[in-house]
Amino acid sequence: MKKYIVLALCLMLAITVVMHNRPPQEAATPTPEVPSGEPPVVMPDPPEVNEPLPVVENANELGRVPILMYHRIVAEEGEWARSIENFRNDLKNLYERGYTLVNLSDFYDGKAQVPPGRSPVVLTFDDSTRGQFNYLLDAAGEKYIDPDCAVGILLDAYARWPELGLAGTFFLNGNPFGQSEYWQEKLKHMVDLGFELGSHTFSHPFFNRITDEEIRADIVKLQLQVWQAVPGYHIRALALPYGIAPRDRTVAVSGSHDGVSFNHSYLMEVGAEPAFAPDHVRHNPLSMPRIAATDELLSRWLDWLDGPLRRYISDGNPDVLTYPDELQEQIKKTP
Ligand SMILES: [Zn+2]
């Protein structure tokens, strides 16, 4: 543990040095004209904020991370369907248990901020159905986000509980989210709101029943569709349709078809347990487990995660890896 504290101090020092040496940012607003004869107005520098991070006694950045799997969000709970009411309650429950929403790739790339003492949770949505993101029209014919769709519910929860954060990874198929007149606008809107777009392939095939070339073609078709709405968007993650991987898993990771290449970093399974932390020796980005969001599985796994040394708890500092001594052997060895 000590060497990490030393490392932390070095890093903080290095960051401070870097920040001080950073060239001044381009001014966002033009410099106001100063009438001749009058001395220019000099704005004082803002006071340096150097608040130390709070020490999180139980920080555990080798702990497990729940990646929840949602499908349809609709009025009635059912198979592959979470009710609107239950989805709202899930967000409240996650907030109260100390979780903060993160996008899958942001978190696993080490780019997501999780406040000190809180735990990351990834919400994933498969099949890009209308209940996940729906527009309604007001009396004047203006579009607005349906407050009962997943995106609307996430926005509302974030407004209530800012520490819950606003994130979610949506695994898209062809013709996403119904309302064919708005699909491009919706994808762009989601990216603007900070959500992540993932691939679930264009036509949702069984990967074990088609050729490798057909797999690549289907993946590229979905990617080209996303690019129509959000040019050049890098899709980082693919959720395996039906949870079935190609015989050679790497076929779904990277490749090209018709001169268009794709490059995924993460493959998502269907089921069945909390995922390993990014720095855990057992983290396998090409086979990431997810927990189906049902009453039974959610309460079972969230209760399990509250057990000793189980769940990921952030130290609040993305530059330092903090974990209990007992887990020393579980750290991923970097070559
Ligand atoms: Zn699916």
Residue map of PLM features:
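Positively charged n-region of N-terminal signal peptides that target proteins for export
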Residues: 1-4
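Substrate-binding clefts and substrate-entry loops adjacent to catalytic sites
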Residues: 198-209
